[in-house]
């Protein structure tokens, strides 16, 4: 069972100009004390065609985390527009908020993001070269996609002892569960986890 549950995530300052920071108010609960840090990341998917355009907008370590309910506002600068392919600047993309513990991602929250010109004339006749200063970002806050992954919450020595106690003497090796989600718009929101995905 996961030792951390996200209870709520609120998208702040939405909609807003493209260059405004991303802001998420995150409420989560720990069912017991965590001795190590949680690492939270905000990732902007720059193109559905290739994950090479993904930008980690910010990463923050939170911890050690005592048992109980916690809330913080996670803010990250807008993506570097020069790293976004011109053909992907306007339209729908994805922003991801991920959390890892001891290097293992255990939850991913994805939101669709629509970037469009606020000026109706620019919407009708978009320029060949995107004008990021004229774009408005609108996050579909009402429909986040939440994907959870099984991880090992114990430290290596505890996990090793547990494996030794639970190993089948006839087997040669324990194969830990592994889940390496792929990227892209649909893939970023719908990786193939080994347990569950739902809407918040």
Swiss-Prot record:
Single GO cellular component term: nucleus
Chief location bin: nucleus
Domain of life: Eukaryota
Coiled-coil segments on the chain, per record: none
Example of a GO biological process term: chromatin organization
Presence of keyword Transmembrane helix: no
Keywords, sorted A to Z: Chaperone, Chromatin regulator, Nucleus, Transcription, Transcription regulation
Cell location: Nucleus
Any single Pfam family the record assigns to this protein: ASF1_hist_chap
Protein family: Belongs to the ASF1 family.
Subunit composition and interactions: Interacts with histone H3 and histone H4.
Function: Histone chaperone that facilitates histone deposition and histone exchange and removal during nucleosome assembly and disassembly.
UniProt protein name: Histone chaperone asf1b
Organism: Xenopus tropicalis (Western clawed frog)
Record lineage: Eukaryota, Metazoa, Chordata, Craniata, Vertebrata
């Amino acid at each position: 069972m996961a030792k951390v549950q996200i209870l709520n995530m609120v998208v702040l300052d939405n909609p807003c100009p493209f260059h405004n920071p991303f802001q998420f108010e995150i409420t989560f609960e720990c069912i017991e004390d965590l001795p190590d840090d949680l690492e939270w990341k905000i990732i902007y998917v720059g193109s559905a065609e290739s994950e090479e355009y993904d930008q980690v907008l910010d990463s923050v370590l939170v911890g050690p985390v005592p048992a109980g309910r916690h809330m913080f506002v996670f803010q990250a600068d807008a993506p570097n527009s020069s790293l976004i392919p011109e053909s992907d600047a306007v339209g729908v993309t994805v922003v991801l908020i991920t959390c890892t513990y001891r290097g293992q991602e255990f939850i991913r929250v994805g939101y669709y993001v629509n970037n469009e010109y606020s000026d109706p004339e620019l919407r009708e006749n978009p320029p060949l070269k995107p004008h990021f200063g004229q774009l408005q970002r609108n996050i579909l806050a009402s429909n986040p996609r939440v994907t959870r992954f099984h991880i090992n919450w114990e430290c290596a020595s505890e996990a090793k002892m547990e494996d030794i106690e639970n190993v089948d003497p006839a087997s040669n090796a324990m194969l830990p569960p592994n889940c390496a989600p792929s990227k892209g718009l649909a893939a970023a929101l719908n990786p193939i986890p080994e347990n569950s995905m739902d809407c918040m």
